[in-house]
């Protein structure tokens, strides 16, 4: 019996690698030997500009999609919420993995009084709108980076009373958090491949 290597493209963040490892573990058999291929995305390189203002479709997926089209990888692991509604020509969604928790959570160093003015960090327009709808006296500031980077920024910040994170993302890197509207496809992982 011959063993086939399956090259799995993934972003380099701890969360992305964890997600890709779960896919790798589920695909490993006696005849398939998956290997992870980390690839840096535009969204991981530029950590200052808000994602919505970057003007790039698939800011976290484009580099992996190009690697698929160039046959450098066989499948990619994306968070489905990051995938553009129209895939690049030649790619299809090969699978969608079972959804994780769809909740958002507030992470803080000291529990803030949510009835008083506060400054909350998030890079998501959806989270910003949702939070300000409920807490109109609060101010929202932008934050960029992977989960670990954002947690470090929150820890060092003297301005922020807290930051909003994905419960599933925190859980996937080993941090388990304890009311929100979620974006379409939030917490779904998808595996694009060549058509």
PLM-predicted stretches and their roles:
Residues 80-81, 89-137:
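A conserved helix-loop-strand patch within extracytoplasmic ligand-binding domains
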Residues 187-193:
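Conserved small/polar residues in nucleotide/adenosyl-binding loops
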């Amino acid at each position: 019996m011959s063993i086939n290597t399956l090259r799995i493209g993934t972003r380099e963040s701890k969360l992305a690698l964890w997600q890709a490892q779960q896919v790798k573990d589920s695909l490993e058999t006696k005849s398939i030997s998956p290997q992870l291929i980390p690839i840096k995305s535009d969204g991981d390189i530029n950590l200052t500009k808000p994602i919505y203002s970057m003007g790039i479709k698939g800011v976290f997926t484009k580099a992996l999609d190009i690697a698929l089209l160039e046959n450098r990888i066989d499948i990619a692991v994306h968070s489905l919420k990051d995938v553009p509604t129209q895939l690049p020509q030649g790619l299809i969604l090969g699978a969608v993995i079972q959804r994780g928790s769809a909740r958002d959570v507030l992470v803080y160093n000291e529990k803030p009084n949510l009835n008083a003015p506060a400054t909350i960090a998030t890079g998501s327009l959806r989270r910003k709108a949702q939070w300000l709808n409920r807490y109109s006296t609060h101010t929202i500031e932008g934050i960029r980076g992977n989960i670990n980077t954002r947690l470090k920024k929150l820890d060092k910040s003297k301005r922020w009373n807290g930051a909003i994170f994905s419960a599933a993302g925190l859980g996937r890197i080993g941090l388990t958090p304890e009311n929100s509207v979620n974006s379409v496809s939030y917490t779904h992982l998808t595996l694009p491949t060549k058509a």
